[in-house]
Amino acid sequence: MSDQVLKLVPKDKYFVPEINSAEKARELLEVFFPDGEQAEVEFSDSVKFIDSGSNLEKITCSLCCKSMEINPFQENDIGAEWWYELDETLSSSPDLQTLNVKMPCCGKYAAIQSVDFCGSASFSMFELCIWNPYSDDGISKVQLSELEGILGCELKQIWACY
């Protein structure tokens, strides 16, 4: 069985909340999802890629503006091959500020942070998440607003599947 992870990251990728605020938000996330398996906070000294695992379905190139579907179940899927290579690169590249990647659509190199992951991935220095929250509805607007108030920033939701 796969794991579902609700990830919450600041819309401002450079925003990092106070440690106490992050811990309060983590505790509240556990209250919101009492059946969830593990709530976590993660801080980073630099911007990191926040992935969605197998939920990544589409990217849009920042250079040629073409959208490309990513289907790992389709044989010889160029988008999926590109994603697997990128995933390896991201795990071994400590500096996303200078990382350029070859785009599968136009063959040109784009800054990784300029690629549009169509809402299913992001970049951030802070992440709040809960594993297997067991909620079909996700987080409500009221709950999201409460977490945003504690952390002092607007949040973006990313659902990941591993």
Task: Locate predicted features.
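A structural detector for beta-sheet-dominated domains
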Residues: 9-11, 44, 62, 69-73, ...
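N-terminal alpha-helical interaction blocks
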Residues: 1-59
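Short recognition patches in nucleic-acid-associated and regulatory proteins
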Residues: 66-93
